[in-house]
Amino acid sequence: LTYYTPEYKTKDTDILGAFRMTPQPGVPAEEAGAAVAAESSTGTWTTVWTDGLTSLDRYKGRCYDIEPVAGEENQYIVYVAYPLDLFEEGSVTNMFTSIVGNVFGFKALRALRLEDLRIPPAYSKTFQGPPHGIQVERDKLNKYGRPLLGCTIKPKLGLSAKNYGRAVYECLRGGLDFTKDDENVNSQPFMRWRDRFLFVAEALFKSQAETGEIKGHYLNATAGHCEEMMKRAIFARELGAPIVMHDYLTGGFTANTSLAHYCRDNGLLLHIHRAMHAVISRQKIHGMHFRVLAKGLRMSGGDHIHGGTVVGKLEGEREVTLGFVDLLRDDFIEKDRNRGIYFTQDWVSMPGVIPVASGGIHVWHMPALTEILGDESVPQFGGGTLGHPWGIAPGSVANPVAVETSVQLRNEGR
């Protein structure tokens, strides 16, 4: 049980993890907690001769606290400290491979969920983070003091590139700031990516010329391999598009970090979709909470990320959602267990990420969205724009009217 060290004082440079652990019946919590620390750091199933060739005391993970979960039988929050030297600098991939790579299939555990990570400045400073961040994005768009407005083009699959471009134009011309490729729009037989990019670029420039505003469409660069992804991002930049998009969980953290570096070097904003997150994050006792995936994304890089709505068709509890929204946007976030924040997180100077609210929302939700998420957010109305009873153009006019009214009423204290 050398990995269970309740007397250990955590260092400022340690990465700290909070796991929700359900041991198998008959397995003591201390033993299971030590197993989590061992398996996610230097341990293996037996003592090996080569242990003597290194300093395990320097490199091992330590389970330093175990607390029972109130109201749950045989469930514990286990705190583990990992020395900084266990992780490659600037690699979210390596961090997750170490911390959650193997331990979740461990026999001694019935279930295990990573609830939160504390990323020390000594580690976060090795990452570029978001390509631009909230303030630079607003400066690029010249839009301040209100949420930015988006719309996912529907039907998500089946439109030709020309008709897709027409829908983009109608939405942007009416008053939206952004339109969006759906996460599964890549390059299918009915609409190849290059055709889509060209027709969308035409819609962008036409709507910009007519409205005098800067417009964007999240061109999904996600592809089957990294070289193809980069080719699409480069083509988007050559067309003069201001923003591209990536599905960061299906595409992978390595691909995402490569794209984020390209975006910063070339002045592109990066919109991130979290497709597949619920596979990992939805179960309450096993997997990984979305706040951990959100922290990973902020380090890997993205200017927008879908973060739940609190009011639409997709699940999201208010306090917990606001907890990880703050972890995305703010510099310094205090520990607050009511909001699911297990550790105080200091991002130092890393740029923030704008949370995107999308999924079953429409203009009637705007006052609630403005109140809950504030100005630094992007509500996205796909069906709420394209499903307007009078047509797409009136739908896209309704959204800016709703947001301006909501912001004005809030600012006047009504």
From Swiss-Prot:
For this protein, what post-translational modification is recorded in UniProt? The disulfide bond which can form in the large chain dimeric partners within the hexadecamer appears to be associated with oxidative stress and protein turnover.
Named from the GO MF annotations, one term is: monooxygenase activity
Going by the record, the broad EC class of this enzyme is lyase
Q: Spell out the catalytic residues.
A: 154 (proton acceptor), 273 (proton acceptor)
UniProt site positions, description: Transition state stabilizer: 313
Query: Residues bearing N6-carboxylysine?
Result: 180
Q: Where in the cell is it found?
A: Plastid, Chloroplast
Query: Could you tell me the Gene Ontology terms of the biological process aspect for this record?
Result: photorespiration; reductive pentose-phosphate cycle
**Major subcellular site:** plastid
Q: List the keywords (alphabetical).
A: Calvin cycle, Carbon dioxide fixation, Chloroplast, Disulfide bond, Lyase, Magnesium, Metal-binding, Monooxygenase, Oxidoreductase, Photorespiration, Photosynthesis, Plastid
Which positions are annotated as binding Mg(2+)? Answer: 180, 182-183
Its family remark reads: Belongs to the RuBisCO large chain family. Type I subfamily.
Tell me, what does this protein do in biology? RuBisCO catalyzes two reactions: the carboxylation of D-ribulose 1,5-bisphosphate, the primary event in carbon dioxide fixation, as well as the oxidative fragmentation of the pentose substrate in the photorespiration process. Both reactions occur simultaneously and in competition at the same active site.
The record's misc note reads:
The basic functional RuBisCO is composed of a large chain homodimer in a 'head-to-tail' conformation. In form I RuBisCO this homodimer is arranged in a barrel-like tetramer with the small subunits forming a tetrameric 'cap' on each end of the 'barrel'.
What name goes with this protein? Ribulose bisphosphate carboxylase large chain
Name the source organism: Antrophyum reticulatum (Ox-tongue fern)
Q: Corresponding gene?
A: rbcL
